[in-house]
Amino acid sequence: IRDGKDLPAKYSYAQGAMDSLNAKQGRKLCEEKLGLTADLEPCGFFDDNVWFRGIVDLVIVDDDVAWVVDYKTGKSAKYADKGQLELMALTVFAHFPNVQTVKAALLFVVCTAIVKGTYHRASNSTLWEKWLSKYAKMQSAADNDVWNPRTSGLCRRHCAVLECVHNGRN
């Protein structure tokens, strides 16, 4: 989209999705680097006071609506992280004050799947409460150097922490 060219032949399976995005009205920003301060104010990605950073693969801003797309190369959308969509939407709301609705998507270009989410500026405070609560728990763990083990689907075969009680290779 950035260069206005067709995809190389080996990626032709994703050309339809790219054409659809390219046809949308609005200002298209590719690999947009966005930052937020600890007060959740917009700032530059490399600013000294940056607290949160995100890079959005594609943002299309058209008046009060923005489309946000993150391209994924995974073979399955089964474990897609919709939280990434929420954080991208919150960051776009901060940087583009006229935007009232963000239509976000994780576009899995290999398996041709798409995971969508729609977010409204009116829901900002609820979403920020969720994410700031998660951050507070991580900050507390870092401050106290206490990292309680939690089981996940990766423990059995993929965890590198052999001393963890949940590691399946013990």
Language-model features: locations:
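Catalytic cores of nuclease domains that cleave nucleic-acid phosphodiester backbones
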Residues: 1-68, 76, 83, 97-105
